[in-house]
Swiss-Prot record:
Pathway named in the protein's UniProt entry: Cofactor biosynthesis; coenzyme A biosynthesis; CoA from (R)-pantothenate: step 1/5
Comp. bias intervals (Low complexity): 168-179
Motif extent (Nucleolar localization signal): 82-94
Classification of source organism: Eukaryota, Metazoa, Chordata, Craniata, Vertebrata
Record: residues binding acetyl-CoA: S392, S395, R407
GO terms (BP aspect): aerobic respiration; angiogenesis; coenzyme A biosynthetic process; mitochondrion organization; pantothenate metabolic process; phosphorylation; regulation of bile acid metabolic process; regulation of fatty acid metabolic process
Gene that encodes it: PANK2
Name listed for the protein in its UniProt record: Pantothenate kinase 2, mitochondrial
Gene Ontology CC entries for this record: cytosol; mitochondrial intermembrane space; mitochondrion; nucleus
Length: 570
């Protein structure tokens, strides 16, 4: 045989006669000149396999005369494991003695270029080495499927996947191929409007997290959960949807109560909402924090972990229960900052509204039960605002813009204090029961007022006689202790906590020079007494300069912010 000039000076080539035309064709495409006297001999045992055809690999003359690629195909154990087994998966081209084409391409750049050209021809539908290319870019079904198998099994094939899809757009399906099979094989190869639409859908799917979409706010007293229920599920999506996902959606949306303590606030449901390109309803669910282990167990029973779900959670419980989520439910928690989620949630919910109604509202004539009105408020210019979050405790934030805010102060006397004291003083067992008792009580029998001390108003300092001078001040008297009812004690407790929060909020607003004060948090849920008292106190003590604002979804903003973080919505 003659030595081919363009190749390595120590390399000879040989190929079987049946493949000589294919080899000549490849060398011609590469621009390699082949002398007419070049001999193509039958293959040896250590030949290069390219999906059905064989070409002898380069042979290196060693001083000992031993063949470069091993003594025989049956004895290749002396080769390194990574050469015997390839690079993982099914290699595109392999030497029968165990060497991959990629390894040889590194040793011989010219051979590497030849093999690269062969891969390109295979991807363009040119068939196998030695098989004539069909005209007009058409390829046999066997060639296309072979290229697809290579791409699936080889890391290099995955890197060249975009090239394969673009090139395959010119191919024609094999006779007898089903329409569905053709559509799947040629996904993304259409050139009309349908192709653009399909590509956009696929792009959005890659950017969106997998269902289900949850946001969690695990507080000290209550857990708030928001769940997005997609309403635009296609027939194809429904067919591919796993049973555990269907079970979760049905369980959450078909029930109003979950066990003895879980509640879905149906009146707060946001309908026809668009999130991350999907249309659906946003559900709001709450349950006591002490039931969190039962919630985690339910997630395990419903096989949440098989859905690759990441729970975005905020609140102190995100740290407290992180290990339980991992060990019991096999679920990963993404812990988020509580105040960041709160700001994101309130701004987003205010922007989407409340099913055509205003999210924000205030009270007109709060001190007069007959004339008091709840009126909508347009928070179109929200900045600056003072945000008072009343949960178990209280945090007060000054918000100057979406990304510029600070925590001004807070207090430990919050909703948890009210409920805890009511449990001690009245024997109630639920927050709702405590509020119901407070609505029937009279706090003046418990508190010592200004008029109890001065006999009327304290005009010098502008203190009206009805103002509280000492919370629970009358309870120092044995006679008065015996005269009060549990309802009176509950009412006095509510007034005490609310007055303290209102006083701190007013001082913060004056110091920060902010006129809009927004009160949120689950302490205000179904708590009209506290809201009216806050509204009246701010208006009275500021002489009309401060306005107390409230929101319909008062306790769920942290959970909404966690959901937005899951979807990466600003």
């Amino acid at each position: 045989m003659r030595r081919l000039g363009p190749f390595h000076p120590r390399v000879h080539w040989a190929a079987p006669p049946s493949l000589s035309s294919g080899l000549h064709r490849l060398l011609f495409l590469r621009g390699t000149r082949i002398p007419s006297s070049t001999t193509l001999s039958p293959p040896r045992h250590d030949s290069l396999s390219l999906d059905g055809g064989t070409v002898n690999p380069p042979r290196v003359r060693e001083p000992t005369g031993r063949e470069a690629f091993g003594p025989s195909p049956a004895s290749s154990d002396w080769l390194p494991a990574r050469w015997r087994n390839g690079r993982g998966g099914r290699p595109r081209a392999r030497l029968c003695s165990g060497w991959t084409a990629a390894e040889e391409a590194r040793r011989n750049p010219t051979l590497g270029g030849l093999l690269g050209r062969q891969r390109l021809l295979l991807r363009m539908g040119g068939g196998r080495l030695g098989a004539p290319m069909e005209r007009h870019g058409r390829a046999s079904a066997t060639s296309v499927s072979s290229a697809g198998e290579q791409a699936a099994g080889d890391p290099e094939g995955r890197r060249q996947e975009p090239l394969r899809r673009r090139a395959s757009s010119a191919s024609v399906p094999a006779v007898g191929a089903s329409a569905e099979g053709t559509r799947r094989d040629r996904l993304g190869s259409y050139s009309g409007p349908t192709s653009v639409s399909r590509q956009r859908v696929e792009s959005l799917r890659k950017k969106r997290p997998l269902f289900p979409w949850f946001g969690l706010d695990i507080g000290g007293t209550l857990v708030k959960l928001v769940y997005f229920e997609p309403k635009d599920i296609t027939a194809e999506e429904e067919e591919e949807e796993v049973e555990s996902l269907k079970s979760i959606r049905k369980y959450l949306t078909s029930n109003v109560a979950y066990g003895s303590t879980g509640i879905r606030d149906v009146h707060l449901e946001l309908k026809d909402l668009t999130l991350c390109g999907r249309k659906g309803n946003l559900h709001f669910i709450r349950f006591p924090t002490h039931d969190m282990p039962a919630f985690i167990q339910m997630g395990r029973d419903k096989n949440f972990s098989s859905l690759h779900t990441v729970f975005c959670a905020t609140g102190g419980g995100a740290y407290k229960f992180e290990q339980d989520f991992l060990t019991i439910g096999d679920l990963q928690l993404c812990k988020l900052d509580e105040l960041d989620c709160l700001i994101k949630g309130i701004l987003y919910i205010d922007s989407v509204g409340f099913n055509g109604r205003s999210q924000c509202y205030y009270f007109e004539n709060p001190a007069d039960s007959e004339k008091c009105q709840k009126l909508p408020f347009d928070l179109k210019n929200p900045y600056p605002l003072l945000l008072v979050n009343i949960g178990s405790g209280v945090s007060i934030l000054a918000v100057y813009s979406k990304d510029n805010y600070k925590r001004v102060t807070g207090t430990s006397l919050g909703g948890g204090t009210f409920f805890g004291l009511c449990c001690l003083l009245t024997g109630c067992t639920t927050f709702e029961e405590a509020l119901e008792m407070a609505s029937r009580g009279d706090s003046t029998k418990v508190d010592k007022l200004v008029r109890d001390i001065y006999g009327g108003d304290y005009e010098r300092f502008g203190l009206p006689g009805w103002a509280v001078a000492s919370s629970f001040g009358n309870m120092m008297s044995k006679e008065k202790r015996e005269a009060v009812s549990k309802e009176d004690l509950a009412r006095a407790t509510l007034i005490t906590i609310t007055n303290n929060i209102g006083s701190i909020a007013r001082m913060c607003a004056l110091n920060e020079n902010i006129n809009q004060v927004v009160f949120v948090g689950n302490f205000l849920r179904i708590n009209t007494i506290a809201m009216r008292l806050l509204a009246y106190a701010l208006d009275y003590w500021s002489k009309g300069q401060l306005k107390a604002l409230f929101s319909e979804h008062e306790g769920y903003f942290g959970a909404v912010g966690a959901l937005l973080e899951l979807l990466k919505i600003p």
